[in-house]
């Protein structure tokens, strides 16, 4: 009997336990406690993961009971705590994926439908406008280029008009064709009139530069003695008509008559004889005339012809008047007369008093 007991095979097993370890003291306490148990061969503790590996011929139940009696909660180690629960079939995830794919396809279809033109009054208006443009091209009418902003505004106005006509046509079944034709003719007529006005504006803008040449020709005619040719320059874009008379170059007084509709007043002449030029002359002929200065805008000083030549006469633009160091003739006559009277009085006094030293 004893021989059989001595040679009994020992079954060595390895268990992994989860034990609450918070500090170094807990680590040492658990290790000592497990090593004292009979049949434990090796103990390994991982404090970070609270994992204890025990190898020996001992059941896991005895190890857990010993640790619980010592005040340490212990259980078998499992990497996933919910591993023991039966796994449910993943039907919910499959349903969610199918729903998401259906939503994506629906959003793509809605985006494509949003890009398509709707069958509304505005769409019909634009289609009608395109048809009207085609009819104009077939008729062979001359079309002038229009600015981008004006074209956009006209398109909006025509769209509003056509939308109103379409709304009325829905109620009246018998007047649909006639009202559409009338609206198209009115819109075409408005477009033609606006195109003609734009072309006229472009032509008048191109002819604005010819006013300078006409002004120069009028000045040359003034040299020949025709007193300048009147040149009328019309400005239809601004709605203002101005008539400008070219200044003759042979004018002696240097005063030019500007016939303006905005009622400019008469202009004072400066002392040098240069007139206040029109802005067109200031732009085109800058080197032919002297620029205006404020200090020259006063009347010139004209000396009297009866007094003869004055000493130190200074012409304008200086504001002070000449200084005369010599006395005038009248002052000299008065002084000589007074001196003669004084000498006569002195002689009378000398005769009375005795001699006078001359």
From Swiss-Prot:
Residues 148-181 have a biased composition (Low complexity). Disulfide bonds: none annotated. Coiled coil: none annotated. Residues 184-194, 339-358 have a biased composition (Polar residues). A lipid is attached at residue 355 (S-farnesyl cysteine). Pfam families: HMA (PF00403). Residues 12-75 form the HMA domain. A metal cation binds at residues 23, 26. Residues 100-194, 332-358 are annotated as: Disordered. Signal peptide: none annotated. PANTHER family: HEAVY METAL-ASSOCIATED ISOPRENYLATED PLANT PROTEIN 33-RELATED, HEAVY METAL-ASSOCIATED ISOPRENYLATED PLANT PROTEIN 37. Heavy-metal-binding protein. This is Heavy metal-associated isoprenylated plant protein 37. It comes from Arabidopsis thaliana (Mouse-ear cress).
């Amino acid at each position: 009997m004893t021989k059989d007991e001595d040679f009994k095979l020992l079954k060595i097993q390895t268990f992994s336990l989860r034990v609450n370890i918070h500090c170094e003291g807990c680590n040492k306490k658990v290790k000592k406690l497990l090593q004292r148990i009979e049949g434990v061969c090796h103990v390994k503790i991982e404090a970070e993961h609270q994992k204890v590996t025990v190898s020996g011929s001992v059941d896991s139940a005895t190890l857990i009971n010993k640790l619980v009696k010592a005040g340490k909660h212990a259980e078998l180690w499992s990497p996933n705590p919910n591993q023991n629960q039966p796994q449910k079939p993943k039907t919910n995830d499959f349903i969610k994926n199918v729903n998401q794919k259906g939503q994506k396809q629906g959003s793509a279809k809605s985006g494509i439908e949003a890009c398509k033109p709707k069958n509304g009054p505005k769409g019909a208006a634009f289609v009608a406008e395109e048809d009207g443009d085609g009819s104009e091209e077939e008729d062979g009418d001359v079309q002038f280029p229009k600015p981008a902003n004006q074209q956009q505004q006209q398109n909006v106005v025509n769209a509003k008009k056509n939308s109103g006509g379409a709304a009325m046509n829905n109620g009246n079944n018998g007047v649909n064709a006639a009202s559409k034709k009338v609206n198209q003719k009115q819109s075409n007529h408005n477009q033609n009139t606006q195109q003609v006005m734009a072309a006229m504006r472009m032509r008048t803008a191109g002819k604005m530069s010819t006013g300078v040449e006409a002004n120069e020709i009028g000045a040359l005619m003034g040299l020949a003695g025709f007193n300048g040719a009147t040149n009328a320059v019309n400005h239809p874009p601004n709605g203002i008509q101005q008539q400008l008379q070219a200044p003759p170059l042979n004018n002696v007084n240097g005063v030019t008559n500007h016939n303006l509709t905005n009622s400019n007043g008469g202009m004072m002449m400066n002392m040098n004889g240069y007139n206040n030029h029109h802005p067109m002359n200031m732009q085109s002929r800058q080197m032919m005339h002297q620029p205006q200065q404020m200090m020259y805008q006063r009347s010139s000083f004209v000396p009297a012809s009866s007094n003869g030549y004055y000493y130190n006469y200074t012409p304008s633009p200086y504001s002070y008047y000449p200084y005369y160091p010599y006395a005038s003739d009248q002052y000299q006559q008065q002084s000589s007369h007074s001196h003669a009277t004084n000498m006569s009085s002195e002689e009378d006094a000398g005769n009375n008093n005795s001699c006078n030293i001359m």
